[in-house]
Amino acid sequence: MNQAVSERQFAPHLSLDVEGITVASTNLDNVFNARKIPSSDGSCIFGSLNLPEYQRPYRWSEEQLARLLDDLRGFFSTDAPGHDFYLGSIILHQQGGDGRERGILNIIDGQQRITSLALLHCLQKGDKGAPALEFNSPESYRRIQHNLRWLEQQKLPRIDFSRINVTLVVTRREDDAYRFFETQNTSGVRLGGADIIKAYHLRSVIPATQNDFARTWERLGDLKPLVATLMKSRHWQSLRWRNVASDRDPLLERKQIVTELAERTLANTADIAYRPLQVHRDAWGKDMHSVQPGYAMRQPLGSGVNTMRYVAYFHGLRQTLLDVGEAPPKGSFAYYYKRLSKDACGSVFLSRAYECALLMYASQFGTARLLEVSLWMFRVIFSMRLIREVSVREDGVQAHIRDNPLMDWIASSHSEDELLEYLRSYKYTPTGAGLDKHSIKKRFVESVSITLHLNLPWPNPIRVAAEYDAELCAAIKRISLADIARQGGK
C-alpha cells in the first residue's frame, strides 16, 4: 500500500529549502508498472521510468548481484518477516505528467539496483510489468547479457515485487536532478569525474542530438587517464599554479575535475577552438595562413558541445600518439616512448607528467620533430630520478614541474626551435646515491643506457652520475640527426 511520508523521515540528507522536491514511499511493483503514487506534497508521482542520456552505463558485477540475491533469498524465504524488504531511496527527475497524464521519471540515482531487479523480473515473470528501459551504451548491453546468463545459472528466490519497498525522492527541476546525480553514491558504483562532466555537458546539448553525443561519449571508453592528463595541463601553470589532487584522494580528485571541466566552463554552446595562427608572407606580401587542427589543452571551454568535442579530440590524439602497442618500429618515436617511459620504470608519476607534455606538444605543433622534442622533454622530466636518491613521490613531481615549468615552455613557445632552446638550456646535477645498489634508480639508468647506447663507467656510481647527462645529450643529438636524415632533411 502506498503511503505519503515526510522529507525529514526518509531523506534527511536533502536540503529542505529546495523547492520542487517531493518524497513518497511505495513498492517496486507500482514503480515498474508506472502507477499513480501519492507524494508528500499532496501531488501524484505518475510516470514511466527512463534512463537519461547522461547516466553512466550499467556496471554491476556478479559480486554485487550475489549480495543482492543473498538479501532477497534471506527475505523471501518460508519464514519471511512481516515487514517489507527495503530497497533504499531512488532519486528521480519527473518530466511532464500530472495526476491525469503519465510523464517521464528519469532515474538520477538507483539505476544499478533498478536494472538488476528488472533483470530478475524478466527472468521470473517475463517482460510484462517490467520497466521498458532503453540502454544506449554498448557497455550496458554487454553487462546486461553477462548478468542475465549468470542469473540463469543461480537459484533465484520467488520475489514478490509488491513487497519491495522503495523511497522515491522526486525533483521537477533539471538543475536539482544534476546536483543529486553529482553527489549520490548509494548504488555502490562510485561516480567518477568523467561521469559527472558527461552529465553536466549533455544538459547543454540540444535534445535532438543528446543521444548521439551520449553514444559517442560511451564509445570513448575509460576516460580517467585522459581526464587526469587534462587536469595536469590546466593546473600546472606558473601564473595560476594549482596542485592536482592525487587519485588516492578520490573525493578531492572528483571535486577538482567537476570544478575545472564542468562548473567553470562558460555558459554558451559555441564550439570554439583556440589555435595559434601562422601567417607566411612571400616576397610580394601575399599571405598564406597555417592553423593547427584541434583544440588547445588550456583553452577556455564552453558548456555542452565544446567541452565534449574537446575531450573527444584529446582522446583521439592520445590513442594515436601513445597507444604504441607491444613492438613499435625500432628507432621511431613510439619505440623510444615505450622503452623510456614504460619499460624503464622510472616512475609512474613521472610517466604521467611526460604524457601530459607530449599531448600538449602534439596539440600545439603536431608531430613535426616529435621524436627530437620528446627526447629532450624526457631528459627534463626524468632528471628527477637522477636528482633523488631513491624515491620519487607524487607531490615531488608536482614541485619539479613547478620549479621547471615545462608545460609553460610548451604553451608559450611560437615554434619547435623556441621550445628546444628552453629544453636544451635546462640544467641539473645528478647524484650517485642509490646507484651502488640494486635500486629502482639504478635499474632505470641501466635501462636508459641500453636503449640509448650510453657509454657509462659502471660500476663507479660517482662517475656514472657525473657523466650521465653528457652521454644522454649526445645520444639525443645523434638520434635526432638520424631521424632528420630519414625524413629527407626536413
Features from the language model and the residues they span:
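Flexible coil/loop and intrinsically disordered segments
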Residues: 1-490
